[in-house]
């Protein structure tokens, strides 16, 4: 599974500005989903890869980013 890492409080994606390989996104994806996860910046959001099937990613049901 893969997807955008999401802030549970506001429903927003984690933003990033350096597209492609991105240390911030990799660090955040691994902190949330474990050291086996990968992460990079895609369309100005942190995209996480190699996630377990039940991993919670953006969008959150009933929670819009505002």
Swiss-Prot record:
Keywords: Amidation, Disulfide bond, Ion channel impairing toxin, Neurotoxin, Secreted, Toxin, Voltage-gated sodium channel impairing toxin. The modification Asparagine amide is found at residue 66. Belongs to the long (4 C-C) scorpion toxin superfamily. Sodium channel inhibitor family. Beta subfamily. Beta toxins bind voltage-independently at site-4 of sodium channels and shift the voltage of activation toward more negative potentials thereby affecting sodium channel activation and promoting spontaneous and repetitive firing. A mixture of Cbo2 and Cbo3 is weakly active on the human voltage-gated sodium channels Nav1.4/SCN4A and Nav1.6/SCN8A when tested at 200 nM. In vivo, is toxic to mice when intraperitoneally injected. GO terms for cellular component: extracellular region. Residues 1-66 form the LCN-type CS-alpha/beta domain. It comes from the Eukaryota. It is found in: Secreted. GO terms for molecular function: sodium channel inhibitor activity; toxin activity. Expressed by the venom gland. Negative results: a mixture of Cbo2 and Cbo3 does not modify the currents of the human voltage-gated sodium channels Nav1.1/SCN1A, Nav1.2/SCN2A, Nav1.3/SCN3A, Nav1.5/SCN5A and Nav1.7/SCN9A. Disulfide bonds join 12-65, 16-41, 25-46, 29-48. This is Beta-toxin Cbo2. GO terms for biological process: defense response. The keyword Hydrolase does not apply. Has the structural arrangement of an alpha-helix connected to antiparallel beta-sheets by disulfide bonds (CS-alpha/beta). SMART domains: Knot1. InterPro entries: LCN-type_CS_alpha_beta_dom, Scorpion_toxin-like, Scorpion_toxin-like_sf, Scorpion_toxinL. Gene3D superfamilies: Knottin, scorpion toxin-like. The keyword Secreted applies. Its main location: secreted.
């Amino acid at each position: 599974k893969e997807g955008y890492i999401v802030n549970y409080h506001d429903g927003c994606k984690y933003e990033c500005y350096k597209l492609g390989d991105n240390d911030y996104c990799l660090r955040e994806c691994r902190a949330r989903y474990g050291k086996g996860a990968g992460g990079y910046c895609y369309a100005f959001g942190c995209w996480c890869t190699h996630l377990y099937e039940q991993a919670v990613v953006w969008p959150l049901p009933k929670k819009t980013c505002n």
